């Protein structure tokens, strides 16, 4: 059977999935006991010629959940000052509500069925997001696929031979300021631009659309 979807749509390109970049900054490496401190997301759209581009973004500073463990070395690594009056932190519930509303609207607008996480070393970001979802009992509201994800570290290793975000961005022609790294919003924006280049490069090389398209036996 030949697919009838227009290949220039987001829906057709990712089999009905709606890709969303997610980046988190945390107070440790264990999603179940360490605090989620920042989260940012970025969404995508296709232009009329089927080139992927960044659509919008959203970010929040997060209040530590009750009983969360804060690792000082993690704060030193990401440079987060929990006592800064500029943080304007919100609860996990408030942040996820706003993010999920944005993502669900994008799914509807693009005619997709479900969101899929795009992240650099995606397992880490995915695990912290899903742990927060469970803490605030948003399982029914969660628009993201429970385990499928696009990992830009893996994709960059395949395409560019680089897995470090800054080096992969350099290969992709995406400017990366190392002084701004480990900000959830900045890393999300860079990862989104990197993902666009990975997808668009495959298109430029003739890898998409498939020929013949989506033939099913």
From Swiss-Prot:
Domain of life: Bacteria
HAMAP family on file: RNase_T (MF_00157)
PANTHER family in the cross-refs: DNA POLYMERASE III SUBUNIT EPSILON, RIBONUCLEASE T
GO biological process: DNA replication proofreading; tRNA processing
Segments forming domain Exonuclease: 20-195
Binding site for Mg(2+) 1: 23
Protein name: Ribonuclease T
């Amino acid at each position: 059977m030949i697919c009838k979807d227009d290949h220039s749509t987001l829906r057709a390109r990712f089999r009905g999935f709606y890709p969303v970049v997610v980046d988190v900054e945390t107070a440790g490496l264990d999603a179940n006991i360490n605090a989620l401190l920042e989260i940012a997301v970025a969404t995508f759209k296709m232009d009329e010629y089927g080139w992927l581009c960044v659509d919008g973004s959203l970010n929040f500073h997060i209040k530590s959940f009750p009983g969360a463990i804060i690792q000082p070395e993690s704060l030193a690594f990401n440079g987060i000052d929990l006592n800064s009056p500029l943080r304007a932190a919100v609860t996990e519930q408030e942040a996820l509500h706003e993010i999920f509303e944005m993502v669900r609207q994008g799914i509807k607008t693009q005619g997709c069925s479900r969101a899929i996480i795009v992240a650099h070393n995606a397992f880490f970001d995915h695990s912290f997001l899903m742990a927060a979802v469970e803490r605030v009992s948003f399982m029914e509201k969660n628009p993201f696929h429970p385990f499928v994800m696009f990992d830009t570290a893996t994709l960059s290793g395949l395409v560019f031979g680089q897995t470090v975000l800054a080096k992969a961005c350099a290969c992709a022609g995406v400017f990366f300021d190392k002084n701004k790294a480990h900000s959830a919003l900045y890393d999300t924006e860079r990862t989104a631009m990197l993902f666009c280049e990975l997808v668009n490069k495959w298109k430029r090389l003739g890898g998409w659309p498939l020929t013949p398209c989506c033939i099913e036996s």
